[in-house]
């Protein structure tokens, strides 16, 4: 029926347009009366007609209605439009000149065009009515079904279980209770226990929060409703609250089930915004969600799961016991977790024997589950591009570089001066990093441009770090300043290439003083506080000054002192190892990329493969040291 109505409306509109086009072509305008044949005199005017009639040069004319006169002059036809009020005078002139007068009726349009002005609006209105009725009915409705929930029921297709989720053993243990409740609720009710009504998954983007929710539904074997927080709010008032009610009505019909709300912060931000009042529609939606989760109406058998990476902006009423009373932190995986995740993503991929998953996991600190999936996919794409049958370790190495720093711009032309500048800059980073005790060791350095950088240094930490000591922070700042120091010492000039290094070093130094309490002069203080004043759509967390101008000046002095101290350390290391710098730069300009093994050989003065290396040492170079000075 819907298709029939849709087709009827379409054909009615098509017929109306056809009539409109036809009327355009049969228009009875004066211009269609005037002949445009090649034998017709083009610039024949009404005045010419009168003059030639008076001179007796025209013997016969034909008057077409009261709008035009045609005839023959000098063996050529003319066709002249005339104003209706001039017809009587023209007739008198023609009779006086004894011109033979003929008449023809004015051409008229077909009979049906006269009715067009009445029929066309009616046809268009009927077509519009059919179109609106079709849009109001069925699954494609957007008029009368605004209040319907947009949640998608995911109960068919590939089943996801906890076996598909690597790492997160503690998280899966927490969620296993939810699975047990959905499978066997009587076991809990006999003990008087209540399973949490809501489970909030908190963690950075890409850590697998949605995958965990799907795994819970897959393990329990229950319907799984998924909806985004932004799907609740529309431009019409009351739509969001109506959709929340409809969502829970669907859940009750399919209980036991799981309702998963992704990006909860889109609808669950704290109420009572600042300037101009709150977002009324979003707050009504949130209020309805609070009522449905723990109100007068029981929702037995429905477990609400949600995911967010901004738990700090959520309304406290959402997080209280009885609603989202259990928060499960889904953090970035460690080395073991990255190994497990990568193995899962390599299940259906042909992998060469030289691929070491443990090495890849160690080389990717800070990568999330989504990052590891992207890494495996990029490696597979590179293998296909290189026409290989299996994915090799080389493909993974290049994929890691591409994911971290972007694709190499091998076609970009750099002058010899720029290549030399980048080589000294990256060598400064690498050598300082390898000679400091608490700095991360260099995995690779390159002068091939990537992204917006002219060169790169890849550092490989020995292990995942949850905390950093003061000495580790100082060494990290020293490594960041090593590039600028190398430019200054060996090129006797500095460039804009160190801009990002200086920005990161300054940020770290200021954090040491204002956040970590590592300033000797100011002591163990946190300077600046986070306040919870609300702005539109939630809370804005910003750092406010809670100290005097004198303390602010001391902070600037302390930050400057840390930067100066670390810069002097970097200069000292490079000045004591000038020959090593020159060897590394020479090989870097030749090879463009050096790995950790090659770099260590150059630092020790050993040749690379069969290449001979000038092992001469600068007279000012001291023996290699570990630079443990504080």
UniProtKB/Swiss-Prot annotation:
Cytoplasmic side: 1-7, 133-630
Extent of Basic and acidic residues compositional bias: 620-630
InterPro entries named in the record: AAA+_ATPase (IPR003593), AAA_lid_3 (IPR041569), ATPase_AAA_core (IPR003959), ATPase_AAA_CS (IPR003960), FtsH (IPR005936), P-loop_NTPase (IPR027417), Pept_M41_FtsH_extracell (IPR011546), Peptidase_M41 (IPR000642)
CC cofactor: Zn(2+)
Membrane association type: Multi-pass membrane protein
Biological processes per GO annotation: protein catabolic process; proteolysis
SMART domains recorded: AAA
Family annotation (Pfam families): AAA, AAA_lid_3, FtsH_ext, Peptidase_M41
Cofactor note: Binds 1 zinc ion per subunit.
Active site residues of this protein: 426
Similarity comment text for this entry: In the central section; belongs to the AAA ATPase family.
Name this protein carries in UniProt: ATP-dependent zinc metalloprotease FtsH
Taxonomic lineage of the native organism: Bacteria, Bacillati, Bacillota, Clostridia, Halanaerobiales
